[in-house]
Structure formats: C-alpha cells, structure tokens
Amino acid sequence: MSWLKEVIGTEKAVIAMCHLRALPGDPGFDTRKGMNWVIDRAHDDLMALQNGGVDAVMFSNEFSLPYLTKVRPETTAAMARIIGQLMSEIRVPFGVNVLWDPVASFDLAMATDAKFIREIFTGAYASDFGVWDTNVGETIRHQHRIGADHVKTLFNIVPEAAVYLGNRDVCSIAKSTVFNNNPDALCVSGLTAGARTDSAILKRVKETVPDTVVLANTGVCLENVEEQLCIADGCVTATTFKKDGVFANFVDQARVAKFMEKVRHIRQ
C-alpha cells in the first residue's frame, strides 16, 4: 500500500488541479474585477471538482503566465488568501503548487495545512523562461527548518516547456532522483499543460523505480485514463475537466463526473 491510500484515501488516485486565475502582480490580473472575482471562480471550480467526485485537489497559480522560478511575495499571499477563504468548503485532501518555486510551495503548504506539494525540485533546464536551475539541497533543508517534513513531495522530473541541459535519459534521472532525494512521488509530464504523457516513458519510469509512486502529470483524459492508470499509481488532471477540454475554460462538473465514473470502474 502506498502513501496515496493513507493521505488521499485510495490507490490509483485522481488529483484534480484547481487552476487559480491571474493574481495581483501577474500581467493577466484584472484590476477591475479584483481578487473577489478570482476567489469566486476558484470556489466554482472547487465545487465542480468535488461534486464530480475527485479524490484530491491541488491549487496552483496556473494563470500566472509567464512563470517565475522565484515568485514574488504577493503571489504566495494571494494564494493563501484564496485557500483560506475556501477552507471551510474543502472536503477532500489538498495540495499546493506555486509555479515554479518550491520554497514558496512549502511556505504555502505550512500556512494552509496542505498535504502535498508538486514542484520542479531537481535538475537544470533550458526553458521558455530562460535557463532554469534548482537547488534541491537548500529546498529540502528549508522544508525541514519550517517543520514541513510531513508534507508529501511530488517531484516533476519532466518539466513542461523545458528540456534537461545534460544528455540524460529519463530513467537515469528517475533513479538518481529517488536515490538522492527520497521523493514521495515522481511526476511524468507532456510538453505543456494538457499534453498527453507518453505511456512508454511512463512505463519505463515505473519499471525503473517500482517502489516509488509514479503519477501521470499531464494529458490524462477519458480516452486514455485506463491505459495510463494501468501503468501509473495515479494522475494529476486538469484540462480534461474543463469545458470542452480547453485549458483556458472553467471546470465542467459533468465532465468530471463522467471521468471519475470510469476511474471507479477501472479500480474495480
């Protein structure tokens, strides 16, 4: 039995993303609508996800485009306000993801009592937003300093919109990441949000680290969820839950319910 059963309540868990709209400081933030509009939209998406039957949710500043690797304090503060206002209505285990700043994610997790975080913890990459370096040693020491050792860590080892600077195979990355960092899960992704995770790569990673939870991190949909969950221990899902399966849209509860009905059948 993996920690998914203990923390989320089931194996083959579906972690649904609650994508927060652009926040103060982001280029896309609408100062006329303000934070109350952002909170209301997050509330609507959260309700649709929960009522549709997902196992867990993860809040992320998905519309803070283009992303920073060291976020400014207003981003974390805005996310804390949103989650704080929604707290009384959160009925499932939840995590947080401050894109792309693992230190900020740990800080937010401690402020909100989140159970897990997802981040790019390791590696060096050429990305859409420049050369992207990490410092996992400092990040995990920060986790320990603030008393966040209980927060589960989901290591994204195939970052979206980025490639590893070194010529390393994904399986060697998976193996060394597990050996050096003891992550709670590895996330395997496609190129962007909503892009399908390659099942062959997913299978190779799981075979390389069979004792570590491996999650399909992008592109899981009604048509491929059975194939993906036959390999992975669970999935992180977002775009397929939105109206017409379009990234920019809001969550469609009917799509969520149909997806989760199929997942329940797969689990049997």
Q: Would you name each region that the model predicts?
A:
Residues M1-M35, I140, H144-R145:
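N-terminal amphipathic alpha-helix/helix-capping segment at the start of soluble metabolic enzymes
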Residues T10-E11, A16-M17, L68-V96, T134-T153, ...:
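Alpha-helix-loop-beta-strand connector modules within alpha/beta enzyme cores
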Residues V14-C18, V57-F59, F94-V96, I117-E119, ...:
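Hydrophobic faces of well-ordered beta-strands that scaffold small-molecule active sites
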Residues H19-D44, F94-D101, F155-C171, A216-L222:
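Active-site mouth loops of central-metabolism enzymes
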Residues L20-D26, A104, L108-D184:
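Conserved anion-binding
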Residues G53-A78, A124-D128, P183-R196, K243-V246:
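Glycine-rich, proline-tolerant flexible connector loops at the mouths of alpha/beta enzymes
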Residues V96, D101-A114, S172-A174, V205-P210, ...:
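Catalytic cores of alpha/beta
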Residues R141-H142, A161, C221-E226, C230-Q268:
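Alpha/beta catalytic cores of nucleotide-metabolism and tRNA/nucleoside-modifying enzymes
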